[in-house]
């Protein structure tokens, strides 16, 4: 059996796609009988270690962004992507072709390549390579042009049918091309022998290779003198090829044979011609879907409460069970599963012994088996351990039972299909014989090496004469050097250059802009007209920026979007509680939205009506699948297509009609059950909510985090955020990450209620923050998909503040249109000449379009996190690519407690979002979930591709198609000493920072100078760009553009008087003229 070379990645000659890294097979020994005595402890430890590699994504309704390679965070990023790629069969970086496209369009510069290569080589940069200069110059040449690997099987066709030996590559500089042709022509003419009539022999004394002599003889001496430029170019390339091939043969560099290191399933597929994995997966996919079902299926799986294994055995031992032929002898094993004393771990031990898997191979083998259906296996583990509020929880031990059943099926499949070829009946003997017969092949060939050297010779201006004069030792040195810098190493450095380019642009822009802001010497402590507090989400960056342009006298700030209100929340229309806090936090408090006391009876009647309607709709859905229901659906089903077609052809109009009909019966006014009467929190009515002391701690924490401890404006609006769209199974992934994929409106509302309570304010004052009586907090919800904004509890706003609130409302309306206009430029279906109001209508339509696969782009393009005062980043156009986190060093203490708690959330959360986007972009099929278009919801817990596949964790193609995969860059306003202290004292932060999973820089609070964190120490950032553009408004910078944009300074607007909504729309449209 052949095995791929995992040290580098080559492009296929057909589709030019990178070869996938393969996962290792446990080292099953061919010639020795392994020790297969397994102890339960060893098996449990092996399972515990193997399950770390399973996806950590829970049910899709609570989608939480996280580092896809979380199991490898103890390794540096550069090693982790290789190990993860090998284990999961995925790509660690973009393809070389993609990086070179970025090089050609200027996204990577030659200077970036030189800097990252020099940093990588260090003292080895000046090592000489044959006669072609240094290691640095050779590798730089290899980085600057895409080397197109070609296997032996494809070279014959390319040599015969393409222009490989007729035209130089387009990337070859013209001077190199002319020099090579001219020098080759002179070399040939100097050694041109008189043409003889004997064309069957070559002159051994001639320095020209024999094939070139034959070519010259075939042309004839008189014709050679009349060759044009194209003919000499072709001859030069033939000469270059022949000398390269001769040199490769002369070098005699041996490629070590690689032992079979493939997976067991690929081994058996190669030996038997049958994919055992597919056979087993077909059985388990359907059963896992039934077992994990959360209400999607019509029938409940029998015996589900008895566990995975017993339910499986009962189902497949049933009288009407339908089984594949290879499962006909599995009855005895399944009957053992039905016995009361059956144990999953003992069953796993027996299966390992049956297949001859030794103790040393146990962990790797079990890991391979779990990862065979890693989506389903990961979901079983997540629902077993992290599913307290599932409608249908699963029993403890389900993952072990899943593995036990899989191994039983695998052993039977090996014996069933292997017996015919190897004429033995035991799984262990079949595996031993299969390994013995596996082929071992060499990883490289003479002609494929020749092709690589041939490409470098063109790019480097190496002449045939120069290469013909090289010794065998020099050729060995050259080939060894080339092969030591394989595709994977080149992609690693190309990616480093890709990241460096953006990081330098970002740090230059922040340095220049912060200096400009400092020169303005504005007083940040003056009392603003009002304040707007947002989540740190990158989608809110543009909303904040536009609001600041519309209302220069307002102040904006940001904090994690759960606003320190960690709770299990149940809305008035929700069937159950759900967590609204970061995934790393386990809430202790329960909050419920309830009708006002005066509307309790109306609320109860509405709840009864909703339950009845829900029951009726469920019955209609269920009965439509029966025989009679099918007839009825066939007769009257066409009527149901009317609203569906309307949602596709006129989604916005359909939405308005639906909302108008819904307004006929408005829901009653509600309030939050927020104050707790009991001593301890819980889910019963008396235990719901927070104590007054807990409320005051939450208010103090957020006000300190955002640096708002004095000069309070009359109204402070807290904007939670979420996203709403149709036909989008991943909708929770578009919601607030700080709320575990929930919507942050209830958190903003709860915070506002807490901060407005006079009893809470008295306790806050005791901690040093005086909130004046006239200051009011308002909760709001921003829908990032359609840019709609809703406000909570406005009836509680004093009449004296209503005029100011109307001004806020007007500013927000204009901001919505401007923000939608900036967002719409990224949508191909939105013309670039839309007015802001038309853009707002466009995004509203996208959110209601049943056929829309891209309602919004979510966190796509995220690349930067700023942690510091808004003073130095206000007015900086960051293209919706930055998480903007508020932090005021002057409010913090000498130990940095405020910064520590901010970074404890920001680095794992923002880093996790960035890394999930990174991995889903570099391999959207392996780490991501592919295209949304063939997805089907499975069991209400995830999506499958088509009718039956593994669950697809990760992000879809439509979510990452405009993303640039980079490790996120943190720019933190603090000192080196403070940040080093925080890193050393916090393991989670230390692992992410020292492992290079995130990039780090600091902005000095006093001097605004920037230093980068590199290999454990800080280095000053040298600004290369002295200026960045200054524009009148954001629209003046981005209009007419669809691609990523650079940084720019937005001119500070003068404070304007309030304008009406219609006037604001007209003024906004005027800017685009």
From Swiss-Prot:
Pfam families, per the entry: DabA
What does this protein need as cofactor?
Zn(2+)
- What is the originating organism of this protein? Rhodopirellula baltica (strain DSM 10527 / NCIMB 13988 / SH1)
Q: What is its main location?
A: membrane
Domain of life of the organism encoding this protein:
Bacteria
Function (record text): Part of an energy-coupled inorganic carbon pump.
- Region (Disordered) location: 1-35
Name under which the protein is recorded = Probable inorganic carbon transporter subunit DabA 2
Q: Which family does it belong to?
A: Belongs to the inorganic carbon transporter (TC 9.A.2) DabA family.
Self-association state and partner proteins as the record states = Forms a complex with DabB.
Q: Which residues form a coiled coil?
A: none
Gene name of this polypeptide: dabA2
